[in-house]
Amino acid sequence: MVKTRSTLNSTALRRNKLSTAVAMGVLMVSGDSIAESRVIEEVVITATRRAQSVQDVPINISVVTGDTIRETGVSDLNDLIRLVPGLVTTDLGADAGVNNSLIMRGLNANNPGTNNVLPNVVEPSVSTYLNNSPVFLNLKLADISRVEVLRGPQGTLYGSGSVGGTVRFIFNEPDTQAASASVSAGVSSSSHGDDLNYEFDFVGNLPLSDTAAVRISAGYEEEAGVTDAINISVLDSSGNVVPAGGDAIGGGHTTTTKDDTDGSEVKYVRASVLWDATDNTELLLSVFHQENESDSDTYMRLTDGQTSGEEWENGRRFLTPSEFEADVVSLEVESDFGFATFSSSTTFTETSVTARNDISNLYESIDEATGGIAYFGSPRLAFLTEAEGVFEAVTQEFRLVSNGDNDWDWVAGVYYNDTESDLIVHDVDHSYEAWLASVPDVYYGLGTFLDVLNTFSDRTPPFTGAYYQDRTLDFEDKAVFGELTYHFTEDFQATVGFRKFWQEFDASQVVALPYCGFYCAPDGNLNGSTSEANSAKFDDQLFKFNASYYVNQDSMLYLTWSEGFRHGGANSFPTAGFAGVDPSFIVFDPDEATNVEVGIKGTFGGTTNYTLAVYQIDWENIQLDVFAGALGIPGVVNGDEAKSRGVELELNSQLTDNLRIDFGIGYTDAEITKDAWLLNFTDFAIARDGDPLPGVPDVQASINVDYDKPLENGSSLHFNVNGSYRSSAETNFNADFGNHVEVDGFDKWNASVTWQKDSFSIRAFVNNITDEAGLSGVQNGRAAYSHIGFIGRPRTVGIRLNYEFNE
């Protein structure tokens, strides 16, 4: 038996001791030539399904501890990005709960400015987990133990959706040893807004006995609006646009302005109960609920249709409020069998979204493109998309993980997931029919325009307004997986992994263009509706190989060959009639990423941890969202091939007893490597060999500096400065695709100082010191007033108070 390097490799159930170390985020490592207080803190993770020091795991993993999250004021995903080099997202503000737009290692094919109201059909390229539950939320990052960021394809252990990587959010668990509580409150002010921001958080832990405890966290956050809407259409009592100058036939929009339109609220509560049922078995039941509400989106007005304009103004016709609600219930069971630890993870998830989006510009573009035929040249088209979606999922995973300090380590498991979603989209008319009714008898005595419309269109519920869509998706995934590691010597090990999966995807859809009537219906019905249902089945397998070698006590070389994938499926495109789409686009295949990575990680003198990795990922059958046919029905198609190559460096250094610096930088070269003809409404666009992958900056970097200053009265000061940089990026493959621009690079900086005395602390902070907008995506359709860019929060100055109670 030669495996003696780390006793942490055993997964024998030691939750009380281990979870305490993990919650603290540290295990101190020794150094012969340095003071005990100078050693770098070493984090314990469970990303490989066993507890290990992050420096002993032979892949590139970044960890953001709960302490760092609190000290830097990280609140959500958009904040977290600034601490993790190589992780990219489009800042959608409070609407980020609808779609997972995370990008890692350059693997992305969707436009970062894609409509954020309607959930994408295509699966994300980065999978996300709450503990062991595969769920995406725009999570309020409170009472978090750590965030684990696994770079590169993780298909064997984490399954579908992990082509670029995996992000795991690990919550603090109940503590059976002592009662504790904390309460914090903050107030801040953001540039360009008149009102204040507020936040409140509470965490309480209560032992119920020596073997059971309950933990509750809850909070509320309110962000004031900062964007002014300068072109809002005025509606009358019937909900129709008031014609300019009182001219019902030829008048355009009567408009007004509204200040600070993009305020938002977040409410959350999480309760968990831990029970040591026996000496060898523990159960953790968790219930999580979160609500996000947004008054409107945070846009900038692009006056040039590209990247320049008024940063805190919005030119859209309507405000775009949204509500997002999520419930997650999970049960985790662990039992130590001696030779191995058995784990069961059961999760029930339900999320719902209601949202509105201003799409007046789309209808104006259609009318313009058809020479005024589509909507008779109406001078004040005004349409709002109203969307309601419900998404439910059941996930079950059983795992068996070997224990003991043996030459062989192994993980084996089975996985099941059933996800159902139903989305109803309705484009509501706010002027067209009223305008039609005002136009006199011009069609050979048939009456008003509205009378003419009524002869070939029957707009009865639910087929009212201009567009209607009811989409239902059902996805079932079954898999077996495993990894096997052999330790040839204390310094050399090799791992092989596999995953075999069986998947079934069903899609059905009803789409209608009521104003188009029988002309747009394959069967000639008067409501212009068409329906379609399709299904597809897939089965395949993935593999992984990893080898690592300790060059010396402090440095490890590793090599990884791994695969990741996103599941295939079926589109519910109609194949006949006005909206017909070529039948070859009904089924879309899984895409697959193959990663080759070489890296070195280790420690300098006990004070600095480092990781350096070089990788190349070949991506085949790329999936991307499209709008197909004359109706622009959302779906997924396969592209061809792409390649992403890059270098990543991360340093974590305890320079002195009181000074720590974390630094990371990544370079990514991600591009199409084979021409692909991609469906684009009724036409095709070509993603050409050499085109960049959308939304991927070449360079990203982050730095976090912490300095502690003890004071004579027993109190202390903690100073923090952190910053992030991302270089320019193109928002689509080329100019043949919509919303294509090159957004400039930008950097953002934040600073804070915290005074602490015993259990009480005060934190003063400035976020986004330079008031950088940070443009990350655009929508630049035909109508100039509708050109928008997605930006982040402006400069925010505030103070936060915190009090902790510990028994």
Set out the residue ranges of the language-model regions.
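Membrane-embedded beta-barrel scaffold of Gram-negative outer-membrane proteins
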Residues: 201, 330-359, 550-566, 587-654, ...
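Structural signature of Gram-negative outer-membrane beta-barrels, strongest in the C-terminal barrel
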Residues: 274-280, 400-403, 413-417, 471-617, ...
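Solvent-exposed loop segments that connect transmembrane elements
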Residues: 226-260, 297-317, 358-386, 426-470, ...
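Transmembrane beta-barrel wall of Gram-negative outer-membrane proteins
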Residues: 193-295, 327, 391-392, 396, ...
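C-terminal beta-signal and adjacent terminal beta-strands/loops
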Residues: 4, 428, 661, 724-734, ...
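Acidic, small-polar-rich N-terminal luminal/periplasmic segments of exported/outer-membrane proteins
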Residues: 38-176, 598
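Outer-membrane beta-barrel domain signature, strongest for Gram-negative TonB-dependent receptors
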Residues: 249-411, 417-421, 425, 609-611
